[in-house]
Amino acid sequence: MSSAGVVEMQKAASFRREGGGSMASMWLSADGNGAFSRSSSSSSRRMRGEEDDEEALRWAALQKLPTYDRVRAAILPMVEGEGGEAGGGGGGRRVVVDVHSLGPHERRALLERLVRVADDDNERFLLKLKERISRVGIDMPTIEVRFEHLEVEAEVRVGNSGIPTVLNSITNKIEEAANALGILPTRKQTLRILHDISGIIKPKRMTLLLGPPGSGKTTFLLALAGRLKDLKFSGQVTYNGHQMEDFVPQRTAAYISQHDLHIGEMTVRETLSFSARCQGVGSRFDMLTELTRREKAANIKPDADVDAFMKASAMEGQESNLITDYILKILGLEICADTMVGDDMVRGISGGQRKRVTTGEMLVGPANAFFMDEISTGLDSSTTFQIVKSLRQTIHILGGTAVISLLQPAPETYDLFDDIILLSDGHIVYQGPRENVLEFFELMGFKCPERKGVADFLQEVTSRKDQKQYWAQHDKPYRYVPIKEFASAFQSFHTGRSIANELATPFDKSKSHPAALTTSRYGVSAMELLKANIDRELLLIKRNSFVYIFRTIQLMTVSAMAMTVFFRTKMHRDSVADGVIFMGALFFAVMMIMLNGLSELPLTIFKLPVFFKQRDLLFFPAWTYTIPSWILKSPMSFIEVGGFCFMSYYVIGFDPNVGRFFKQYLLMLAVSQMAAALFRFVGGAARNLIVANVFGSFMLLIFMVLGGFILARDKVNKWWIWGYWISPMMYAQNAVSVNEFLGHSWDKVLNNSLSNETLGVQALMSRGIFPEAKWYWIGFGALLGFIMLFNILFTLALTYLKPDGKSQPSISEEELKEKQANINGNVLDVDTMASSNNLAIVGSTGTGSEIADNSQPTQRGMVLPFTPLSLTFEDIKYSVDMPQEMKAHGIVEDRLELLKGVSGCFRPGVLTALMGVSGAGKTTLMDVLAGRKTGGYIEGNISISGYPKKQETFARVSGYCEQNDIHSPQVTVSESLLFSAWLRLPKDVDSNTRKMFIEEVMELVELKPLRDALVGLPGVNGLSIEQRKRLTIAVELVANPSIIFMDEPTSGLDARAAAIVMRTVRNTVNTGRTVVCTIHQPSIDIFEAFDELFLMKRGGEEIYVGPLGHHSSELIKYFEGIQGVSKITDGYNPATWMLEVTTVSQEQALDVDFCDIYRKSELFQRNKALIQELSTPPPGSSELYFPTQYSQSFLIQCLACLWKQHLSYWRNPPYNAIRLFFTTVIALIFGTIFWDLGGKMGQSQDLFNAMGSMYAAVLFIGVLNGQSVQPVVSVERTVFYRERAAGMYSALPYAFGQVAIEFPYTLVQSVIYSIIVYSMIGFQWTVAKFFWYLFFMFFTLLYFTFYGMMAVGLTPSYHVASIVSSAFYAIWNLFTGFVISRPATPVWWRWYCWICPVAWTLYGLIVSQYGDIVTPMDDGIPVNVFVENYFDFKHSWLGFVAVVIVAFTMLFAFLFGFAIMKLNFQKR
């Protein structure tokens, strides 16, 4: 299992060599025998059989090598046709090879000989390994894990204070500060996750951990793995009697998380190889050395292939090794080994394959104990069975320890385990041998029905909702048996007593194998880890080359624009004012290179989840990660900055001196490196993209404002002068300005000058820049210091900070009451009982899956009537254009047919399962019938109760429950349902009836206790997967549809959750609706809850359409009637059997076509007749007709969308609270930096300073708004696609709601900013001027926000929108009128000033404050005249400017609406 739990093929244990002590002493125990010895003398066994003389000589030569060389050399057959390379096919002459340098071909050939088919050969191979180790008396290290009196608690907010509204986020932060100071008592409640549990996990035994969601399984596994840091923890966990402090638990045991965090740009093989390289080989090398020494002494010749395998897998420092290949094979990942893992942006492997990569990542290491959390999610039952079987072989043969949590283990998988731990609400209800578990529950009065999987029974029997159906003591009345009662009864049960007795005797530490527990912190040397990270970083730079190429092109483009704006023929050196324009060009260059570093933020943050996972698993220390990310990206700066400087230096007309050119290039390189380091640090410290964007912009803004150009040094107030001295941009601006203005072309004294200073020095002094030449090197040195500082801070942040946490844990009062009632057996109040007792039939009669049914008569019709409708379809064909990849492989057809003439019918009150293997076309057929396809070619007839289907009307009477459970994250369950009902129920349904109907639906789907729970984002916060599934169903049900399609409603759920969802589905059918579900791999009782089956085979053809029958009898009878089909065995799942006997390989083996057999059957004729019958409209019926496309008017749609957006925004503090907080802080900082500068108008520099305050605020707060709105709109757009397809509303009301909700938040933001800044900077206090200032700020922030929304609307994803919009921000910045005024802009670019929205904002702000002031400045020119001459800003234009600003706002909002209406980036 070495190499990964699944392998540790030598489980020599994870004991590492530590410095000091000889090899011999390391493996000697106290009595003088070797650490791996089992007896004092090793047996001496001779080689058997005759050997080829040549090979015998080769082996003899190998044995004579020194130990170090001997463990690196193996004898392998030569590869035919490979020029003598070894490692190939089975036969041929054998040669001695160095195992450290085996190539992929040789490794593959060796594995083929050892484990050709994982299913058949793995056990044989492991037994060979074990036999080799055992025969020289070496013992495998084992670990026994004990946990005693384990208690874990968390602090949670209960009720409304836990809902993250803008107000709550502020009050909770204040409350936490007051708690910390001891001013206020905390309102949080303590929630116990684990309740005083004790037990033993034995080695060489497989332990299955079961329990419903929220029972504490993940917390328990984390506690066993020594990974609980953030929760209150008491009790102890020991390994072989040793406390956690005595060894390194993260490396001794491997915790495999249920979250699949991987770098999408790496292939599966690269991901596992990197993991293996970091984790090292544990004690495999040391054990191998001892093994070969003993074999040599005993003159034993091992199996050559096994010897080669063990040697190759004991070598450290290989970029890819044999263990990786072995794990890929046994996890069934060979087929996708060289495919990218993928993520949201990169297409990659499937969810099930990704789950296996997560498992394999830890199996390639040398850990001896494995704690695996839900490793089967997304896998089909046969793959899960195969993986668990391989793990079982490794654990049993090589002596590992494993606790594995599974969601819905099939009976055959369940039977692979030796022990069971059943956890419920933090109590251990049972722990011990699998054989005794049913005996315990029978003693408690509960019996598992015949056709019920034991694992499913165990997960349901402790639940209040499900327990009653299993009550077996019919002579006694049933009463609810609470969890506490089960737990205490288990203590008295014989298994519980034996565990208690064993725990009473402490583990004898002297029996612990010296190599069992790992004491070194990392698997390999620091230099090896650094090398591994360097190789990975180089790979990722290559794979992400698009980002760097795009960044370079973007910088070049801006450089090209800059050099044509500051064109040398227009750049003069006749006055200080000319110098200011040159300085503007230099400022713009420095700022663009700073902004170019901003792309490090998302690149850093997207990799952090994987980094934190690997750091916490002790793959490597943070510095081995941060150094490569700094050093290896430096060459990019040379190219990007080189392009910028080489293009622009001469064309702009900077000082024509080659030395000064290279000094400018050197300085810009330092700026580029400093910016990248700064933003990496911000990303590492913030760990969240929204927060990082805010603080990255914030730091950039502060550095820029205090950088010496926007506000001259002599104007910086004394309380902010420290900020000037620590701003990297100050040093950059000083150095680059000194380099230019002390050059020869500025070395002249003006005739009209009052001083003898050169023009260059005067220009420098006019902006408060130090005019001495030494300031170039001071600036350069300071930038190098900042580069070092930010990289060190980045390393420290990644070393000590925790991963970005989930939001504050909260729980509703109803959930808390229900939890306590389940534990203690308290009676629940009426509201909570309403949902707990809403039980209905799940299975067909006699299966034991019945549940007392108290609700049929009253719920049959429900409050709102509906018309039952049937759906028939005949000869449905669906094809798409042939993919280019397939054409490249020689396929000549123009179209690829996915459905081939499928026919069938779905009827009211009949629950139909749509099944088939992956690629059979289940979801495709459902999408075609529901009208959800956005492309492709559809042929055939679809009728609704005999009338041709029209999509506009069909959407009104149908519901579609998608597999992905897409909902707005910031609304509650009841609000989601109200929104759906409001927009989809007919106009004539009044609000009271609507509310009653919603209550009925919530009761039907058991959502009442969760009515006030926030939906949240999947896998991040809010509802669990199973609760989201039920919400998806409820959202469709409140539309009162007649026909409902459900795509995989039980995938990713545990057995109990799947039963709850199926009960919901069954309840829905019992109301008389037509329901069709695609289903993946159902358990027996879920499968038999269906009435009919529509079975498809790969290629899109039906092979069985008809009733299931009692205990699936009709289905079994049909397939067993086909000659050659193997009979089903007793108790076997009919669904699994049916899929197994209808595979393509079975068709080929039997030489039949199941589709042909079905089309020639009597069943097909019956179905044809039924389709004919249902395709004729019943007498007296009429075709579906609705006077309008949507059930509600345009106005109601707008109001409903606005209502939902209001709730979403109010409960989104990371977006709204942070932008309001940021705006307030920026306003206070600006107010203090530009304190009282608004009233100073003596010099032109005073006006530039005031304009600088406006420019910086507008640009940065505006860009912040534009950036931070994008992820919000992107999440809501995916919900919009689902809701529009469901016929809830048209695109414009959605766009209206999204646009309108921004008005109040932006107004508050503008008012906060304007009041603070206006008063502190000291602009003229007149009502008109203040309101003009507020007006321009408000509409500017609004158009920036709408521009960000528009960018999302026009692009397929948030990431692309972010890149596109940032390119335009750079161009806007150039043409604002601040860096270079409009009159100074070359005529060929002046047109852009008129279409740049920020230029109009600055026009409005300047002219409204200064355009009417006639007071003369020190040089006698009136202020308004200077403003008009220098900027070309006319006060008479103020009204027109205001209209233009409003027009830009409306334009961006309109374009957002247009994009949402016309563009659909969802492809189906």
UniProtKB/Swiss-Prot annotation:
How is the protein disposed in the membrane? Multi-pass membrane protein
One annotated GO molecular function is: ATP hydrolysis activity
Q: What is the top-level taxon of the source organism?
A: Eukaryota
Q: Which residues form the ABC transporter domain?
A: 178-450, 871-1123
GO cellular component terms, alphabetically, are: membrane
Q: Which InterPro entries match?
A: AAA+_ATPase, ABC2_TM, ABC_trans_N, ABC_transporter-like_ATP-bd, ABCG_dom, ABCG_PDR_1, ABCG_PDR_2, P-loop_NTPase
Transmembrane feature ranges: 546-566, 575-595, 634-654, 666-686, 690-710, 778-798, 1217-1237, 1247-1267, 1303-1323, 1330-1350, 1360-1380, 1387-1407, 1440-1460
* A Pfam family that the UniProt record links to this protein: ABC_trans_N
Gene3D superfamilies, alphabetically? P-loop containing nucleotide triphosphate hydrolases
> Which residues make up the binding site for ATP 1?
211-218
Residues bound to ATP 2:
916-923
Which intervals hold domain ABC transmembrane type-2?
528-741, 1196-1410
Among CDD domains, the record links this protein to:
ABCG_PDR_domain1, ABCG_PDR_domain2
Q: What does this protein do?
A: May be a general defense protein.
Q: Which family does it belong to?
A: Belongs to the ABC transporter superfamily. ABCG family. PDR (TC 3.A.1.205) subfamily.
Q: What is this protein called?
A: ABC transporter G family member 34
